[in-house]
Amino acid sequence: MYLIFNTAIQNEEFEKIIGTRNHTEEFTNASGEAMTKEWITTNKFLTGEKDQPEGIQVIGGKTGTTSNAGSCLVLYSKKGEKPYISIVFKAENADGLYEEMTQLLKEI
């Protein structure tokens, strides 16, 4: 996961996308109907539901949850100008995920 994410952040557009809090798009579906869809980030650092550790700037990331993998987060952040990719897999729940990630970020 690190290798994929590290390659992806080399693309400036990817960095912009992962840091987007919400996005609304208008499109035409396969039946020819005009549609509007809104995407809202589930990254609690970006929504403000969880505080970013002092001195760390969260740029964005990828969240996910499955029964096998638990709650997961791949996060791109910076301390000063130095970039970091931090990963937490198999957290029991979202609260635990952000507690673990916060502790990891504090070690930077």
Model-flagged regions — what are they?
Residues Y2-I108:
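Penicillin-recognizing serine hydrolase domain
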